[in-house]
Swiss-Prot record:
Subunit structure: Heterotrimer of A, B and C subunits.
Protein known as: Probable glutamyl-tRNA(Gln) amidotransferase subunit C
Enzyme Commission number(s) from the entry: 6.3.5.-
Lineage: Archaea, Methanobacteriati, Methanobacteriota, Methanomada group, Methanococci
Reactions catalysed: L-glutamyl-tRNA(Gln) + L-glutamine + ATP + H2O = L-glutaminyl-tRNA(Gln) + L-glutamate + ADP + phosphate + H(+); L-aspartyl-tRNA(Asn) + L-glutamine + ATP + H2O = L-asparaginyl-tRNA(Asn) + L-glutamate + ADP + phosphate + 2 H(+)
């Protein structure tokens, strides 16, 4: 780039900074922040006890790849684990 272009870019950048500074001066940046502690974990609905579905275990074990004699799912340990 030539010297003229560099000076033009510097001048435009300075104008942008000046305009931005003018806008910032209109805001009160010295105000205090407010913090809120919310005890409610689920604000969309009431928490209720979960009902278990007795058919779930049976259906789950049907689609499991391998189940032992006690009725537990047998899984392969990841090769990346020691």
């Amino acid at each position: 780039m030539d010297e003229k272009t560099i000076e033009k870019i510097k001048k435009e950048a300075e104008e942008i900074i000046n305009k931005f500074s003018e806008v910032l001066e209109k805001f009160n940046l010295e105000m205090e922040e407010s913090y809120y502690i919310i005890d409610t974990r689920n604000v969309l609905r009431e928490d209720e006890a979960v009902e278990s579905n007795p058919e779930f275990r049976e259906k789950f074990l049907k689609i499991a790849p391998k189940v032992n004699k006690e009725g537990y799912v047998v899984v392969e340990k990841g090769s990346w684990l020691k």
